[in-house]
Amino acid sequence: MPPPPRTALLAASSRCLKCYEIGLKYASRNFSALNRPLPNYPGHVPLNRIERGVLAIGSAFGSLINPYRHDLIAALGEATATPYFIYRLRDAMLSNPTGRRILRDRPRITSETLKLPYLRNLPENSVGWTYAKWLDKEGVTPDSRDSVQYIDDEECAYVMQRYRECHDFYHAVTGLPTMVEGELALKAFEFLNTVLPMTGLSLAAVVRLKPAERERFFKLHLPWAVRSGLSSEELINVYWEEQLERNVDDLRTELGIETPPDLREIRRMMRQQEKRAKEQQAQGSSS
């Protein structure tokens, strides 16, 4: 793959600036619930600027209170992605041969399209086997992703949907679990890789971590996220459906992603240390 096209995270192409102006014009239209424009695609909900702002603020506070409200996180992602950031991500796909193919083919990631029983029977350490194993271990399914509603441009709505559906592949290739600590590490990586504001805003949930977890995040996983996020290829351009039989280690190397510290193993070792410390304390007090 060629080097990442982003030399600066917020550098914009002329196409992106033009799309920004178009999106800003659309967002500033004076409409209300009585004269709302027709939807641009099935499920689309047009919003004016005030409604988009209210949605962003409300979903941000709601997702901070409950990080497992995926519907609020999805709404936050859409409300803050326009009028600039989702166009930047779309332009990154247009500037990449594989990204252009994805935009042309419009593949969807579901348990049916991926044929999960087939993935479970692939060789160990293949991308597909790793993905299916991660889904089973975490108890999640690719069918649970919310549909995009609040992105006005139909093509950009697909880009957001594609990012959303690929999220579990990012989990699988990094090995990060769905617990809050793992999600924060992945969101930090995604922010530097995609520049979507929601991924950066999600890091506010670090205040919900326990002191030991917060210290571990800043010492181990945040430095990993910065290194890998800045040096890796743009993951939106990965045609995951064509990588399923590849060795996951080879793909990680090709994409420029370091393997992060094993969060589950770290937490297991910490629990064992705490258990031994309590046992020693109990023995000392009884002697």
From Swiss-Prot:
Cysteine disulfide partners in this protein: none
Main location: mitochondrion
GO cellular component, one term: extrinsic component of mitochondrial inner membrane
Membrane topology: Peripheral membrane protein
Catalytic activity as recorded in UniProt: a 4-hydroxy-3-methoxy-5-(all-trans-polyprenyl)benzoate + H(+) = a 2-methoxy-6-(all-trans-polyprenyl)phenol + CO2
GO biological process, one term: ubiquinone biosynthetic process
Keyword Signal: no
Subcellular location per the Swiss-Prot or TrEMBL entry: Mitochondrion inner membrane
Pathway, per record: Cofactor biosynthesis; ubiquinone biosynthesis
The entry's keywords: Lyase, Membrane, Metal-binding, Mitochondrion, Mitochondrion inner membrane, Ubiquinone biosynthesis, Zinc
Pfam families: Coq4
Keyword Membrane in record: yes
Cofactor(s) annotated in UniProt: Zn(2+)
Positions bound to Zn(2+): 167-168, 171, 183
InterPro entries, per the entry: Coq4, Coq4_euk
Its EC number(s): 4.1.1.130
UniProt xrefs under HAMAP family: Coq4 (MF_03111)
Stated role: Lyase that catalyzes the C1-decarboxylation of 4-hydroxy-3-methoxy-5-(all-trans-polyprenyl)benzoic acid into 2-methoxy-6-(all-trans-polyprenyl)phenol during ubiquinone biosynthesis.
More info: This protein may be expected to contain an N-terminal transit peptide but none has been predicted.
Similarity field: Belongs to the COQ4 family.
Assembly with partners or alone: Component of a multi-subunit COQ enzyme complex, composed of at least coq3, coq4, coq5, coq6, coq7 and coq9.
Name of this protein: Ubiquinone biosynthesis protein coq4, mitochondrial
Species the sequence originates in: Talaromyces marneffei (strain ATCC 18224 / CBS 334.59 / QM 7333)
